[in-house]
C-alpha cells in the first residue's frame, strides 16, 4: 500500500478538495485511487460530518474494493467500511466509508433527493460512462449548487476526458496522478484470426512453455467464451509433458461468478506456478490483479445495444476502442516490464478502432432512467432538458416516454402517475414493477413475485435456454422439469420455483434437474426482499414461501398472465394469420419469431397463440422474442387502442409517431381496423377449449 502512487499526492489532493466543491482526478490504473481516496479523506476528517460514498459501475468492484479497504483499515467488513449493491446491503449506522453501485445511489436519492447523509460522493470509474453514472453526474451538478457549503464531489477515472468533465462542472480543477507502470512491449498479429478463442489458446500455451514466470491475463468477450477457453486451457495444460514447464492454475473472472470464486484471482499462486486469468473487460480497470506480466487481447468486447425504433436489444461482439486497448495493454506493466499480444494488426488498431467507448446512455433503453427522473418530482428537473454530459437522442427519450405511457407510469401529458410513483419504489425494470402492481390488484402477487425474481437472476437458470434447437429438444426429452402447461416460459419459471420450494429448497433437486444452485438461491433471496418491499403496498398479508408449498392453479396462471400483459403492454406481439410468425405492436411494427428455447405450445392445428407478451426482443440470426407467454385477446384490445391513440407530441412535444403495419393480416386486424372490446365470456370459451386440448396432450 505504501508504494501506491496516489499516496504521494495526498497533500495536494486534500488541499484541492478543501478549496473546491468538485475535483476531477485522472489516475492511471493501479495508482490506488479506488482504495485510497476514501481513506485519505477519512484521515482528514471528512467522515465527521457524513459518510463518504464511492460509486462503482459494477457490483463485483463495489464488493471487492470495500473488502480490500476494510482489510487495510483492519475493521470488520460491514461496519466502518461497507458496501451496498442491488439486493444486498452490508452497512450499518456506524458505516463511514460506503462503496455502492451507481444504481443503488440513484435509488437512495429517491427517498433523500439531497443525499445529505453524504459529506463526499466519489464517482469512480467514470470513464466507463455507465448510464447510471452519467445521470449521477447531472444530479450531483445540481446538488453542488444547492449544498455547496457541506458537500464535495470527486470524479475519478483512468482514461476520462478530464477537460470535458471540468467544463461540465464550470471549470473545476483536474488532477493527474501517474501510475507506476513499467514498459510494455506490444506485439500485433499479422491478421485477424478465424477464432479468437483458438488463437488465444495457442498464444497462451506458447507463453507458458517459452516465457519466464509471470501470470497471463486473457481478455474474452463473455462468460461463454471464458468457459470454453478455460476448458481448452485445462485440457492443453494437462497434455504437456511433466516437467517441461511450471505448474498452472486457471481462473475465470466475470461478473456472474460468486464472490468466493472472484476473490481467488487476488491470491498469489504457489511457488513455481503460473496463473492464467481468463476475464471479461472487468479486468481492464475495475479490478487490478497483481502479478500479471503477459496480456492477450482478443480486441473484442460484448456490448448490449438497444434500438429505440424497434424496441430490440442485441448483445453484439464488437471491436474495442483505442482507450480499452491501451488499458488492457497497461495491465501487463504493473509489477515489471511485460508483453501484450494483440490478436489484430496494427492497421486495425489505428484505422478501425474508435477513440473511446460509446456512452451507455446513447445505446440503451432509457425507460427506467426517465421514470427515475420523473419520480424525483423536482421543479428544476425537466427530463427533456436534463443536464447530461452527453445527451441521448430525442428518439431514445421519446421511446422511453412511450414505454412508460403504455404501462400507465405516466399520463397522456407526460406527468408521472400514482402507479408510476409506486413503480419507482421497486428496484426493477419498469415492466417487472408494473407486473407486480397489477398482480397485487388481480390476486396473484405471490406467483408474480416468483416470476419476477426468476427473471431478475444474474445468469441463465435453465441450461436449455441457451442451447441450439436440436440440443434443446434432446434436453427437453430427458428433462423432468415442468413445461409451462402450454402457456409459455413465465409459467414454466413459476412451476420450476414451486417444484424446488416443495423440496424445501434442496440443492440436490437443482443438480438433478440441471439448474444452477447458486442462481436459484439468489432467486429465493431476491423474492424475499421484493416480498418485503411489496408488503407496504399489498392488499393482503404476504407470505415469502410459495403459497405454503402448493402448486398454483390454472386460475392463478390466468391471473398471472393478465398481470404480465399489463406489465408488458409495450412488449406484445400478434400472430400472423397464416403462419406462426408474429408482429410487434407497440414499436415500429416488425416480424419476429418465438425463440427456439421457448416452451410455448402450439394448438391442435399447429398454430401458436394469437397473442403473446415477451420479456425481451433480441437480434441474433433473426429477431426473436425471449421469455414468451400467451395472453388473451380481451386483454390486448384496449392496449392496442391505447397504442393507436398515442400522441407523442403531448408526451414530449416531439413529432407524432407512425406505426408501419406489414401487409399480411393478423388475427386481430383481419376483421376490423377499429377493434371493439372482446367479451370475457367468448375469451373464456376459447380458453376452455385450449385447456381441453392441452389436457389431451398430457400437459396438465
Swiss-Prot record:
ATP binds at residues 27-34. GO terms for biological process: mRNA processing; RNA splicing. It comes from the Eukaryota. It comes from Arabidopsis thaliana (Mouse-ear cress). Its EC number is 3.6.4.13. Residues 463-486, 654-682 are annotated as: Disordered. The keyword RNA-binding does not apply. Belongs to the DEAD box helicase family. DEAH subfamily. PRP22 sub-subfamily. Residues 200-377 form the Helicase C-terminal domain. A motif (DEAH box) lies at residues 124-127. GO terms for cellular component: spliceosomal complex. Residues 14-178 form the Helicase ATP-binding domain. This is Probable pre-mRNA-splicing factor ATP-dependent RNA helicase DEAH4. Keywords: Acetylation, ATP-binding, Helicase, Hydrolase, mRNA processing, mRNA splicing, Nucleotide-binding, Spliceosome. GO terms for molecular function: ATP binding; ATP hydrolysis activity; RNA helicase activity. It catalyses: ATP + H2O = ADP + phosphate + H(+). It is an enzyme of class 3 (hydrolase). May be involved in pre-mRNA splicing. The modification N-acetylalanine is found at residue 2.
